[in-house]
């Protein structure tokens, strides 16, 4: 008997223009458009294997080796149902000889190679990998934008992980959500020297989940309404132009402004929401001072911080300046050196140690033992990948190879 199985991986994306707030909570339709950078899967990714079999008695999912119940009406169930519907409409209805996989239950195993729910977008890469593996299993002849419509219903930001490079999630205007989808602004090959330095400030679960937090903001923040109407549309256009022109200075300015406003909107929520902590704020001070020196010398910024709904910093920087940024973080957070894999060989045979650029005012922040737990250096990357059987997460019987 045939085995119907496929494995795919999907990347993390980090927004430069933030998504925060839904106009429809069931379909996950956003109050504003957003734009993100896809990070390289060689460093951060979710991998998912999906199998369909007539002998399976129910749909089942394991996340990082632990079974996760697929609750009726949940986002997970919605995504699986929608993918089965696409299989029927796009394949089985058109080709009567195609196996009726849409009628089989599925078993799905998913694994993240980074901490889940820690301010790194695990739900985005997770739902993108889920949809991509089911699309491969079902042999769907559809575009990433079409798949993004389904991934969006799992986790809004997941729709942006269906492409590599620079990706916009267009908010759309239709009530059914059919125009709220992801489009690629530029592929990863357009700006290959753009790198990202992730400072892992805290890998514990956060206090206020994004889902709960953003709806409280929609209900109570007047600043969010100003942001939606007057700020985001202009920023979306400006940052898209900056990306097309590879204008790092403009890209950095807009990215930092939008991160600041997102956290201002969280603070404007009643009661207020705090995602950044004192370590996060210290990193902002370091990047502001680093850019002050850069502007004095060259007239342009050289780094951009951004924070999602958590304390971790993501710092965008051109490849030639990455070492200065890592040096800076290690100068103020020396413990981070223990959890920094130097995958790009910045230090070659040198010892990893902190330093600041000349002209830097070291009084802008205090040294902080244990403040940054680790540093991840990565770069811009591609969209979902279909993987071979040797990377499958399910064994011959259709159960996870690794259980927690």
Regions found by a protein language model. Name each.
Residues 1-118, 132-144, 371-404:
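ATP-binding N-lobe of GHMP and related small-molecule kinases
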Residues 2-15, 21-25, 29, 57, ...:
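C-terminal nucleotide
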Residues 90-193, 203:
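Gly/Ser-rich oxyanion-binding loop with an adjacent helix/lid
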Residues 15-18, 46-50, 158-161, 165-170, ...:
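Short beta-strand scaffold segments in enzyme catalytic cores
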Residues 78, 82, 159-171, 230-234, ...:
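Charged/polar, low-hydrophobicity segments characteristic of intrinsically disordered regions
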Residues 68-75, 126, 143, 275, ...:
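Short amphipathic alpha-helical segments
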Residues 24-25, 40-44, 119, 125, ...:
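Short capping/connector residues at structural and topological boundaries
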């Amino acid at each position: 008997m045939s085995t119907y199985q496929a494995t795919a991986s999907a990347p993390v994306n980090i927004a430069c223009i933030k998504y925060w707030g839904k106009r429809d909570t069931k379909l996950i339709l956003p109050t504003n458009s957003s734009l993100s950078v896809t990070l390289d899967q060689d460093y951060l990714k979710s991998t998912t294997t999906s199998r369909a079999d007539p002998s399976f008695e129910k749909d089942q999912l394991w996340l990082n080796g632990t079974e996760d119940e697929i609750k009726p009406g949940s986002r997970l169930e919605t995504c699986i149902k929608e993918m089965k519907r696409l299989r029927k409409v796009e394949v089985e209805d058109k080709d009567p000889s195609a196996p009726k996989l849409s009628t089989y239950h599925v078993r799905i195993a998913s694994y993240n190679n980074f901490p889940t729910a820690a301010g790194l977008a695990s739900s985005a890469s997770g739902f993108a990998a889920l949809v991509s593996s089911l699309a491969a299993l079902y042999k769907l002849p559809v575009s990433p934008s079409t798949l993004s419509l389904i991934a969006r219903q799992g986790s809004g930001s997941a729709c942006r992980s269906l492409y590599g490079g620079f990706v916009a999630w267009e908010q759309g205007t239709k009530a059914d959500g059919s125009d709220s989808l992801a489009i690629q602004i530029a592929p990863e090959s357009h700006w290959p020297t753009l790198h990202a330095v992730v400072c892992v400030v805290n890998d514990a679960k956060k206090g206020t989940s994004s889902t709960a937090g953003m709806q409280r903001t929609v209900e109570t923040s007047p600043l969010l309404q100003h942001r939606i109407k007057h700020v985001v549309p202009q920023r979306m256009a400006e940052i898209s132009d900056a990306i097309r022109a590879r204008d790092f200075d403009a890209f950095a300015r807009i990215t930092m402004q939008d991160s600041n406003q997102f956290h201002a909107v969280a603070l404007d929520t009643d009661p207020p929401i705090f995602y950044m902590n004192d370590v996060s704020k210290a990193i902002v001070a370091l990047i502001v001072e680093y850019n002050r020196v850069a502007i004095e010398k060259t007239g342009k910024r050289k780094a951009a911080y951004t924070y999602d709904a958590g304390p971790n910093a993501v710092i965008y920087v051109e490849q030639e300046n990455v070492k200065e940024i890592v040096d800076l973080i290690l100068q103020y957070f020396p413990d981070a050196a223990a959890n920094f894999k130097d995958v790009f060989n910045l230090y070659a045979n040198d010892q990893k140690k902190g330093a600041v650029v000349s002209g830097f005012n070291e009084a802008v922040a205090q040294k902080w033992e244990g403040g940054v737990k680790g540093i991840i250096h990565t770069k811009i990357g591609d969209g979902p990948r279909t993987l071979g059987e040797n990377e499958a997460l399910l064994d011959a019987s259709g159960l996870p190879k690794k259980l927690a």
